Every structure is written in structure tokens, then in C-alpha cells.
Amino acid sequence: MSRAALDKDPRDVVAMFDDVAHRYDLTNTVLSLGQDRYWRRATRSALRIGPGQKVLDLAAGTAVSTAELSKSGAWCVAADFSVRMLATGGARKVPKVAADATQLPFSDGVFDAVTISFGLRNIADYQAALREMARVTRPGGQLVVCEFSTPTNALVANVYTEYLMRALPQVARLVSSNPDAYIYLAESIRAWPDQVTLACQLSRTGWASPRWRNLTGGIVALHAADKPVR
């Protein structure tokens, strides 16, 4: 059984991210060949947010994504279940909350937008998390999910698969404090639903008008959806 096929016990996932927190941002930049910065900017651009609005950045890790979202002028809060990840990002001056994505400590409809970047894949019951995100979003509000996906070009897909399964673990051994975490990363990406399947899941969990935009040839996809106005 692959690591990605495991039950993703929250305690194990938290322990894994706690273990990689210290060098997490550096490792991600190296392993993505610097594309992580582009993906964060694209996520911010996909959100229709500005001053006076409230945004929840879920699975925010060290809050590097939250800091990018804050450039919009909106009030953005970073939430993650790894306290060590949040503490590692302590220098980033955004509010931070330790939270379980399936049981968020927020009232109904308090956010104008919710985003989650490269975190949905790590949640055992990600459909429950999507429903929770819908609960805390106001009617007419929006969701943006930035996640690894399925390359649309066969050549890109072949090269990417080779990188994931061969090169990435080797590079991770050089730059990460826990290389096994990045073997899990590679396997979980391969096991993750494609663009169409994830869009269908959004429709089934309280979100309307799901759509997506491929980034870097479909290696990453930005899925967006709206909270229905009742």
C-alpha cells in the first residue's frame, strides 16, 4: 500500500508537517523550481477580494500564502492544524489560528472568501472540509482551491511523473529535514482526482458554478466556486 493510500490519520499528518516546518518554504521553492511564487500570485488574482473583506486561508502552513493574499488589502487569517508550521511563520504579520479543516472554529458565513493551497489533498475527509468551508463563507462568497492536478499534455505528464517519482525524492533528501514526507507528496499527487472530478466534488459539497484554470500545463489547477445565494 502506498503512503497516499493510507488513512491520513490527522495525528500522523500533523507530525509530518511539524517535522518539516523549519525548512518547508525553502524546500517547496526548490522542488517547484520557483513556481510556488507564481502559483501564490495566481491564487490571489483568482480571488475577487479587496479592503474591508475577510479571507480565510486554510492549511496555510507558515502563512506565506496568507501574506500574499494580504497584498489585496483584505483582512486575511491563516489557519492550519500544525502549530509548529504557524510558529515557523511567526514573522509574517497576519492573524494565525490553529484549526482542523473539518471542524473550523468560526461562525457561519463570517468570511467573504476561503482559499486552500496544496492542503486539500492532505485531509482524510476532504469533502467534509469543503462543506465546512462553505459553512463559514457568506452567501455569494467564493472559494479558490490551488492544488496539484493532472497535466493536460501527454509529454508534460510523462516528464512530470518521472520528476515526481524519481528526481523529487532525491532532491528532497538534500534540502528537506524529512525526505519521506516528500515521497508521500509525490504519491498523494498521483492519487489525487483530476480537474473534472474535483469540480464535481465542489458541486456536491455546497458550492456552485465550479470552474478551473490550469497553471504550468495542468501540473497545478486553480478551482473556483461560489457560495449559493439563497
Swiss-Prot record:
What gene name does this entry carry? menG
| Gene3D superfamilies linked | Vaccinia Virus protein VP39
Binding of S-adenosyl-L-methionine occurs at: 62, 80, 100-101, 117
Pfam families, alphabetized: Ubie_methyltran (PF01209)
Alphabetical UniProt keywords = Menaquinone biosynthesis, Methyltransferase, S-adenosyl-L-methionine, Transferase
Q: Name one GO molecular function term.
A: demethylmenaquinone methyltransferase activity
Similarity remark:
Belongs to the class I-like SAM-binding methyltransferase superfamily. MenG/UbiE family.
Report the pathway entry: Quinol/quinone metabolism; menaquinone biosynthesis; menaquinol from 1,4-dihydroxy-2-naphthoate: step 2/2
Keyword check for S-adenosyl-L-methionine, yes or no: yes
Write out the function statement from the record. Answer: Methyltransferase required for the conversion of demethylmenaquinol (DMKH2) to menaquinol (MKH2).
One GO biological process from the UniProt record? menaquinone biosynthetic process
Instruction: Write the Enzyme Commission number(s) for this entry.
Output: 2.1.1.163
**Catalytic reaction list:** a 2-demethylmenaquinol + S-adenosyl-L-methionine = a menaquinol + S-adenosyl-L-homocysteine + H(+)
Q: Which InterPro entries match?
A: SAM-dependent_MTases_sf (IPR029063), UbiE/COQ5_MeTrFase (IPR004033), UbiE/COQ5_MeTrFase_CS (IPR023576)
The organism of origin for this protein? Mycobacterium leprae (strain TN)
Give the main EC class: transferase
Designated name of the protein: Demethylmenaquinone methyltransferase
